């Protein structure tokens, strides 16, 4: 009932043989060459969970719940998988909104849920943050499903910021290899650019420029060149590398 009233409109639900639940969102159709079909969502039955399966690399980039991260991963004993089917055929914007509607529905449906983990980006949130969300529209996806990661390069002053999770929507992840800039400025810049790519529907091509940073804010008087490259940090994927001008580090083709 919570799905129908608040989140998906018209739905059909059925239970699988293994107690999984399939939810068909009848108001969200995907068109194919030979017809069309509604988007579906899956909730698996409860499974045992062992926090030790989350590696140190992934843990190191869980910036949104650093104080509670270890407690959650140590104390949680059960998990369930929630995902979508056929949603790849939707526009990036519609899929982002629909997935976040699903997230909010899950937070309501399972009041005893402690946390949400986004396997596509490595983000971990306490469930209460989802329940208290004040963000509307597609920026919910940027907040919860896109991880802006930060790395220092051993043996140098170089730093690297990248995003992980935009590729879920078939949009480019971002990458910045730089030195001499406040990394928090770059993190904010990355979230702003990611939001622009999702909400505007515009593409950024290799060789084009975007507004850079001055005193922590985006500034049109400074232009940073963009180009597509292979990611420097796992997982392997193409990224839109943003050259920070005089603060750029590393070699670019």
Which residues fall in each region the model found?
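Low-complexity, flexible helical/coil segments
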Residues: 18-27, 114-121, 152-154
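Short, intrinsically disordered low-complexity segments
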Residues: 7-70
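Short, small-residue-biased leader/transition segments that mark boundaries at the very start
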Residues: 2-3
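A short, structural micro-pattern
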Residues: 33-37, 73-76, 110, 234
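Internal, hydrophobic cores of structured domains that mediate oligomerization or house catalytic pockets
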Residues: 44-147
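Conserved short hydrophobic interaction patches
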Residues: 7, 102-109, 193-196, 200
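Aromatic/basic-lined ligand-recognition segments
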Residues: 118-253
């Amino acid at each position: 009932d919570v799905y129908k009233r608040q989140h998906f409109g018209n739905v059909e639900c059925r239970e699988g043989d293994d107690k999984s639940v399939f939810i068909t969102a009848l108001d969200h159709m995907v068109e194919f060459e030979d017809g069309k079909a509604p988007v579906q969502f899956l909730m698996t039955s409860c499974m045992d969970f062992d926090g030790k399966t989350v590696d140190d690399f992934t843990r190191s980039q869980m910036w949104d719940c650093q104080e509670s991260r270890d407690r959650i991963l140590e104390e949680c004993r059960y998990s369930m998988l929630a995902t979508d089917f056929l949603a790849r055929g939707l526009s990036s914007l519609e899929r982002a909104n629909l997935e976040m509607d699903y997230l909010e529905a899950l937070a309501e449906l399972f009041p005893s849920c402690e946390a949400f983990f986004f396997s596509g980006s490595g983000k971990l949130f306490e469930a209460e943050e989802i329940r208290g969300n004040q963000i509307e529209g597609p920026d919910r996806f940027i907040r919860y499903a896109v991880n802006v990661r930060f790395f220092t390069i051993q043996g140098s002053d170089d730093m690297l910021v990248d995003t992980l999770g935009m590729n879920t929507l078939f949009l480019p992840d971002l990458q910045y290899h730089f030195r001499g800039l406040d990394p928090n400025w770059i993190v904010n810049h990355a979230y702003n650019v990611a939001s622009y790519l999702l909400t505007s529907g515009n593409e950024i091509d290799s060789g084009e420029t975007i507004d850079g940073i001055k005193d922590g804010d985006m500034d049109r008087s400074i232009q940073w060149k963009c180009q597509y490259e292979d990611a420097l940090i796992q997982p392997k994927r193409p990224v839109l590398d943003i050259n920070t001008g005089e603060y750029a580090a590393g070699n670019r083709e």
